[in-house]
């Protein structure tokens, strides 16, 4: 029931945006910007690009609110716009490659040693690298399912594919990640 109320509330916000209500746009931004930023950051592996793309998503929402047809949840529509914007950004970046600056390390937790911080940073880098090794299609499906907890039916709506195709992409992504980490583990053990 709560899900249904959130959906109708999102639709009413979108209707307000269609009428030019900037407060409605602000409310939708506050509601979805954090999740969309996490999503775009996972897909792009570059925080600055992710922030730009997330802003672009909301500009598109404001200028294209009239194109929302109501067949999918507003959240699915937003994630679809974000996925398309990330694909466009990755295509553009492949033509003119840029090297993202490494993220500023998180401040150490009380009592945390340098070894623990380095290990955490290495693990994050390994996960990002592994996600980057997936195809765009696999990465999008996996990130929507595992990091954002969307059900397969909603992922299918976001990506414009069948539920079966979603399951296949996620299965193949997980298998590719398992193989990559197993390969890395073997290489790591051989080096020690």
Where are these regions (language model features)?
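Residues within the DNA-recognition helix of helix-turn-helix
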Residues: 32, 169-176
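Internal acidic/polar
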Residues: 6-10, 96-120, 124
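Sigma70-family region 2
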Residues: 18-19, 45, 56-73, 92-93
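Helix-turn-helix DNA-binding module
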Residues: 125-140, 144-165
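Arg/Lys-rich amphipathic alpha helix in sigma70-family domain 2
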Residues: 63-70, 80-100, 120, 172, ...
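Structural recognition of an alpha-helix C-terminal capping motif at a helix-to-coil junction
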Residues: 52-59, 72-84
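A short, charge-rich alpha-helical start-of-domain segment used by transcription regulators
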Residues: 14-37, 62, 129, 139
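Short, charged helix-capping/linker segments at alpha-helix termini
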Residues: 2-4, 18-27, 37-56, 163, ...
């Amino acid at each position: 029931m709560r899900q249904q109320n959130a959906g109708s509330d999102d639709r009413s916000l979108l209707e307000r945006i269609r009428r030019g209500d900037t407060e409605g746009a602000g409310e939708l931004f506050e509601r979805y910007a954090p999740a969309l930023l996490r999503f775009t950051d996972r897909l792009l592996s570059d925080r600055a690009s992710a922030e730009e793309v997330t802003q672009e998503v909301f500009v598109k929402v404001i200028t294209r609110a009239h194109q929302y047809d109501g067949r999918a949840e507003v959240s699915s529509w937003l994630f679809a716009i974000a996925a398309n914007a990330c694909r466009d950004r990755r295509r553009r970046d492949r033509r003119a490659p840029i090297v993202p600056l490494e993220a500023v390390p998180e401040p150490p937790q009380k009592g945390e040693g340098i070894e623990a911080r380095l290990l955490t940073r290495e693990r994050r880098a390994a996960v990002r690298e592994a996600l980057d090794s997936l195809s765009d299609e696999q990465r999008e499906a996996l990130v929507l399912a595992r990091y954002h907890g969307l059900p397969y039916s909603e992922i299918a709506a976001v990506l414009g594919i069948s539920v079966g195709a979603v399951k296949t992409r996620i299965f193949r992504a997980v298998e590719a990640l398992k193989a990559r980490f197993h390969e890395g583990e073997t290489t790591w053990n051989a080096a020690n």
